[in-house]
Curated annotation (Swiss-Prot):
It holds the Pfam family TK. Its EC number is 2.7.1.21. This is Thymidine kinase. Zn(2+) binds at C146, C148, C183, H186.
Length: 192
């Protein structure tokens, strides 16, 4: 029986690396995978692949707010059997797309593995994360650590001087140096 999985964490926990490793494991056994990543991440660089911080890459389809995932996946699956769907940056999915993914699991019987952030720099849920927390069959937290050694489960956005940014757009692109993964204790200490 196929399931919808949501692998979530703070930044720098290796989500993309885990996604690419999972895809490789399927492919190594002669199974076909289909990878997606968010258009919002790709717009600036015009890329159509997933790249981990340690250098692993794979081509990927792009989704945006209008993408009908169930329809796209159904068409591709009819052409040639897909054994697993893997979605990077799944926190950018919307409610309808998460429901589409439940249909991929329940109707097409294809497992779907989603990887993304749970919350933003203000500790607010992303839309995709909210709906995946509600609809996923399995919730798996990937671990990363705070500078104090505790498990990091929050993200702080910082400016060039290392000061915490408390307001602004939920989505801001730049390098990983603009974000720091911290535990809840240090989130409260630094954010408030």
């Amino acid at each position: 029986m196929s399931k919808l999985y949501f692998y979530y964490s703070a930044m720098n926990a290796g989500k993309t690396t885990a996604l690419l490793q999972s895809s490789y494991n399927y492919q190594e056994r002669g199974m076909r995978t289909l990878l997606y990543t968010a258009a919002v991440v790709c717009q600036k660089n015009d890329i159509k692949y997933i790249r981990s911080r340690i250098g692993l890459t794979s081509s990927a389809r792009i989704f945006n707010g209008k993408t009908n995932l169930f329809k796209q996946i159904s068409i591709v699956n009819k052409e040639k059997k897909i054994h697993c769907i893997l979605i990077d940056e799944c926190h950018f999915l919307n409610r309808n797309q998460v429901i589409d993914l439940t249909k991929v699991v329940d109707i097409l019987n294809i497992p779907v593995l989603c990887y993304g952030l749970r919350t933003d720099f203000q500790s607010k849920l992303f839309s995709g994360s909210l709906w995946l927390l509600a609809w996923a069959d399995k919730l798996i937290e990937l671990k990363t650590i705070c500078y104090c050694g505790r498990q990091a489960n929050r993200v702080l956005r910082i400016d060039n001087n290392g000061c915490v940014i408390r307001a602004g757009s939920q989505i801001m692109f730049g390098d990983n140096n603009q974000y720091v993964s911290v535990c809840r204790k240090h989130f409260h200490k630094k954010y408030n």
